[in-house]
């Protein structure tokens, strides 16, 4: 089979104006970025259509290092729905440069189920990530200047919370000292997070419009003064400057798939260190024009889907009609104690054992009132008997099941899934959304409910620093914010080596971060870092420009 990049280059793309016209977007509302990419102003959002049309979430079982192919399922389903005559639109996240040059090598789907132009999407795209990085670091520079000027005054800063960000994987930047050298500012310990972990990214993806963006940016807490008063962006009077840097980026990006299905790609927080969903604005824009809108939440259902429901849907008033859990036989075997290098070998017993991981995710999604369909991503190593084993297991539980072969066959390979999705939404759509916790619950109650009900933890403990921060948040009257857990994506627990469905484990909250602008409380567990490092063999060594063509992206 051809490589992803070969398939992408051979695809016959339509001009983006034609894609927009097919959706019913007036040409006055198409802002071209070349021939095949455009921005669409969020002013086109029609709330009546948003409520009427069908939102579908794609999530997954606990992933292997290679992933489960969730984006391939999302794009494949959009292709399959269009294949059977439905008006489908994908609403996905933008890839981060860090993982593209690190482990993943790209995040635009795969095979014959890709969003295009793949090279542009995976690299700089429309500059949204650069705008977010610039906005975040502009705040850093202006706050450092404020700190420098406020020395020796009643406004002097005692505690600095705000770091810097870059869209790279660079472990050397996790802890740094700034201000060294005479006349170079105030010496302080600081660090860098990756751009998808930036609070600006979270705000960008949760804001409903430019004024909401401004309000949230103004409310970001940067640090505390000598009298322990919170210092916010609005105290510096710089929110206008930051909004100016984001005024174009806030509009969602329109592209197309390998079969010219429209897709909005906008925003890109990770689900292990942030809330893991594309922008509310892009999702609502897609729902304005698409009868069926397929979106996804990062990593597995315990991370991305929980945050999608408890944070994004809670705040945006969204109510999905269906949740799809993507799985692979290889991923299930890994949860049945097969080493990752051997998951391509037939092993029915390990597959049966690994189904417990799928069952736990199904159980969790039902807690949110969701109707569930399982989409098994077909790989070249799959054998029919193992596919049937998973099918029969799902059917015995009353859960819909379909094989997705869009990677190899495009939309044709997702027709079975598309037909099942339409039938399920028509006959048994999800119930009104339920949440794991209530706004009025205490911070520890919220964290406890997520850890015990969704992850299956036996207990939750807190470091002294976490306890201290929880008390400070409660005293500030912000305890009603939703909780965003930062933990490993490779296990229900905070230990990435505990596969399957571990029990009896303890979760430790190492730190608590208040994101007062994005209005969420981040609970950091285990060894989770908000700035990833590079692997021993990064994808960057395979990326090159050959005769004007990019090689090594996938």
From Swiss-Prot:
Pathway field: One-carbon metabolism; tetrahydrofolate interconversion
UniProt xrefs under PROSITE patterns: FTHFS_1 (PS00721)
InterPro entries: Formate_THF_ligase, Formate_THF_ligase_CS, P-loop_NTPase
UniProt KW keywords: ATP-binding, Ligase, Nucleotide-binding, One-carbon metabolism
Presence of the UniProt keyword Signal in the record: no
Enzyme type, top EC level: ligase
Pfam family, one: FTHFS
SUPFAM superfamilies in the record: P-loop containing nucleoside triphosphate hydrolases
An example Gene Ontology molecular-function term: formate-tetrahydrofolate ligase activity
EC number per UniProt: 6.3.4.3
Annotated residues for binding of ATP: 64-71
Record flagged with keyword Ligase: yes
GO biological process: tetrahydrofolate interconversion
Catalysed reactions, as listed in the record: (6S)-5,6,7,8-tetrahydrofolate + formate + ATP = (6R)-10-formyltetrahydrofolate + ADP + phosphate
Record-stated family: Belongs to the formate--tetrahydrofolate ligase family.
HAMAP family listed in its UniProt record: FTHFS
Entry-linked NCBIfam families: PRK13505.1 (NF010030)
Protein name as it appears in the record: Formate--tetrahydrofolate ligase
Species of provenance: Treponema denticola (strain ATCC 35405 / DSM 14222 / CIP 103919 / JCM 8153 / KCTC 15104)
